[in-house]
């Protein structure tokens, strides 16, 4: 749909006769990648901004059947927030976030906060800088990727999707500890 809208805008404006800018072409390419994004496979890596990592994360969130546990430092990407809020209607969603995210709320975080998702603030001396998502205690995503528009569209970021049970179990133990110690 975004690809179609972008093309219609190009054709309906007076600029259709001019050569589209590099930025317009990049946005069209990224939109088409997002449309074609499939849920991540086991042991898959995604590198932003060259790949549709935000769309891949949305697809990953949409695969949850029972529970999603998220530890995230920052969130400004509305599409990711919408996927979390939508998932929270049908599966248990728990989030541990950095205290700055709670203070500096924005539209994306507000969407999740208004949903049935349970959110707690990480308790630690410094910042809660983790970035990982656990799905159904069986699969996970981790890496440098924050839930931000910049992470998916301009920053050099990485995501790693895993289902190795021993690794997922370690992250689940870590999340459960963070959850118990976090502030409501």
Language-model region placement:
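A short, well-structured juxtamembrane/interface segment
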Residues: 52-56
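Solvent-exposed loop/turn segments at secondary-structure junctions
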Residues: 74-78, 99-103, 125-127, 139-140, ...
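N-terminal low-complexity, Pro/Thr/Ser-rich intrinsically disordered segments
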Residues: 21-50
């Amino acid at each position: 749909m975004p690809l179609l809208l972008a093309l219609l805008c190009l054709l309906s404006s007076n600029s259709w006769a001019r050569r589209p800018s590099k930025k317009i072409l990049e946005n069209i390419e990224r939109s088409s990648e997002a449309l074609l994004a499939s849920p991540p496979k086991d042991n898959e890596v995604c590198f932003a901004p060259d790949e549709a990592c935000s769309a891949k994360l949305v697809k990953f969130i949409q695969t949850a059947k029972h529970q999603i546990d998220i530890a995230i430092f920052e969130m400004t990407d509305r599409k990711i927030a919408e996927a979390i809020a939508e998932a929270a209607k049908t599966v248990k969603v728990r989030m541990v976030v950095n205290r700055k995210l709670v203070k500096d709320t924005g539209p994306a975080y507000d969407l999740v906060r208004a949903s049935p998702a349970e959110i707690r603030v990480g308790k630690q001396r410094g910042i809660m800088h983790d970035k990982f998502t656990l799905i159904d205690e069986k699969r996970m995503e981790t890496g440098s990727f924050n839930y931000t528009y910049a992470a998916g569209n301009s920053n050099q970021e990485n995501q790693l999707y895993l289902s190795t049970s021993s690794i997922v179990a370690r992250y689940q133990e870590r999340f459960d500890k963070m959850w118990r110690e976090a502030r409501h």
